[in-house]
Regions:
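Non-catalytic cap/lid and distal C-terminal segments of serine-dependent acyl enzymes
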Residues: 1-189
Length: 189
């Protein structure tokens, strides 16, 4: 039986616990010498680490895909990148007072790949995300092309509000961080 587990990691970078939810395939508990490919699955704005597993039923979908032979067994992990859902969602990027990208690459990814039996190389590591998570996916795939064999950015959010800005409010565009746009400019050929 596959399983979904929610846990947390303390981040020295963010000075806080950050939750994550992880899908472990059916053979994970029995085949203790086996390592698995991994998909980092980034939630959208107003989502949390559990959203992919509750709203989009990742466990059920993966179990069906593996059973039909359409997908191989893999580990899927979704970290929480949200802030206060009523006001601000800082997301997957570094900005004043929020160094999430540093946390992701210096703490989270190494922790996951050490704690769980992950094939921790480019050939076996992918990233995907929706909305805010799609923006994180596109930016990370461009900034760290040697890290991922595949990236899937769904409806990528281009403008990330400045930390503390109210979601849905449209402040002066000169005050917004267009992280993905900047990433495209800096990392494209």
């Amino acid at each position: 039986q596959s399983k979904v587990v929610t846990d947390s990691i303390y981040s020295q970078v963010l000075k806080a616990h950050r939750a994550y939810t992880i899908y472990l395939p059916q053979s994970y508990s029995n085949e203790t010498d086996r390592k698995y490919p991994i998909l980092y699955l980034l939630h959208g704005m107003s989502g949390v680490n559990t959203s992919w597993f509750t709203d989009q039923r990742v466990k059920d979908v993966m179990d069906q895909l593996v059973a039909s032979g359409e997908a191989c067994e893999m580990i899927i992990v979704s970290p929480n990148a949200g802030g206060n859902p009523a006001t601000c969602w800082n997301g997957y990027f570094n900005m004043p007072g929020w160094a999430y990208e540093d946390f992701f690459y210096k703490e989270f990814l190494p922790y996951i790949e050490k704690t769980y039996r992950v094939k921790g190389d480019k050939r076996h590591r992918a990233i995907a995300g929706l909305s805010m998570g799609g923006g994180g996916t596109a930016s990370y795939a461009q900034r760290y092309p040697d890290m991922y064999c595949a990236a899937y950015a769904m409806s990528a959010l281009m403008n990330i509000p400045v930390s503390g800005e109210e979601v849905g409010r449209d402040p002066d565009p000169t005050n917004k961080m267009a992280v993905l746009t900047r990433s495209v400019q800096e990392h494209s050929c």
